[in-house]
Amino acid sequence: MSDHCSQYALSDSKDPAFRGTCTQDHDLICNRCEDLKAVLSETQKAIQESCFECQYDKEDALHRFQEATRAIQLWKSHQLRLVNQDNARIDVIECLDDSKVLLVQDWAMKFLPRQYRESQGEWFAKKGISWHITVAIRKKESELETQAFVHVVEKCIQDSPCVVQLMEHVLSTLKREHPEIKSAFYRQDNAGCYHAANTILACKDISQRSGIFIQQLDFSDPQGGKGACDRFAATMKNHVRSFVNEGNDVLTAEQFLSALTSRGGVSGARVSLVQGNSSSKTNVKWPGISKLNNFEFSSDGVRVWRAYQVGEGKFFPWSEFEGTFYPLYLSLSLTLPLPYCYSPPPPPQKKDFASIV
C-alpha cells in the first residue's frame, strides 16, 4: 500500500526539500486495489485472446484499454492529492479563532445577460459578466461564521492584478469592521490568475496595506476545495433568476448588481461593483511555480511545498525576487453592509436502516 501513503507517494525523488520521511514498511495489501489490478489484467487478457475482423481493430481495442488504464491510475493519483491538500483546509479550520480568518476565493462562471422576454436570436453571441466570490470563514465562541464578498467586475480581464486588488479590498474591509482579525489563510484553485508569481508575491504588500497578515496560501486539487464559493454562487444565480422572472432584465453589470441586491439580497453575502481599467505590471519570474501548491509567509520570505506537509519545504527570501508589482487600480463601492451570518446548524444524524423499517 505504498501508493496509499501520502508521505511516500507524494515525495519528490529528486529534491530532498520536498521529500517526506515515512517509517512504515508498506507491506500491507489493499483488497480493492488488488481487485482493480486483477480486473485490468483479465480485461487485457480477454482483448488479446479475442478474435477481431482485422489486426487494426485489435490494436485499436488494446490502445483504448491502455488509455483507460492510464486514466484510472491518474484518477487514483488525483484522489490521493485531493485528500492530502484538503488536510490544509481542515488544519486551518481547527486553528481558527477570533483573530484568524480563512478565505476561499474563486471566479464564478460568467453570468450570461438575460431578458425577461427575448427571442431565440437574442440568446446567442452574449458577452458574459465576470464576478468573483470570496467566502470568509472564522470561528467565534466555538461556532463557525461565514460571509461572502461578491465583486461584479465590469470590463476587466480575470488576471493577476485584478485578483490582487480584490484580495486587498476584502482584507481591508474585514480589518475595518473587525479590528481583532490579525491573520488570514487563503485557499483557491489552480487558475492562472491565482497560481502566478505576481499574485503570490503581492501578498507581502497586501498584508502591509490591509493590516491583516496573510500567513498561508494553499491551492486545492481540481474539483476539491472551493465548494463554499460554489454554494454561494448557486444561491445567487437562483436569486437572479427569480429577479428576472419578476419582469426585469439583467443585461449590464449594474443590472446584475441590482438583481443580487434585490429583496434584501442573499443572506450572508455582500456585493460590490468593480469598474476595471487597463492594468500595468512587471512580471516576476519564478521557475517551477506551477508545481508549488502550499505557501507559508513570514517577514523574511516564503516557504513553499509541492504537497502539504511533505518534506521540510524550500525557503525563498524576499530578496531573491526582482521586479516590482503594480496592482490594478479599481473603483470599488461596497453595498449591503451586512454582518457575519452564522452557519446553519448541522444536519440531523442519519438513522439506522434497521430502525426505519
At which residue positions do the language-model features occur?
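Extended mixed-charge, aromatic/glycine-enriched low-complexity segments
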Residues: 1-357
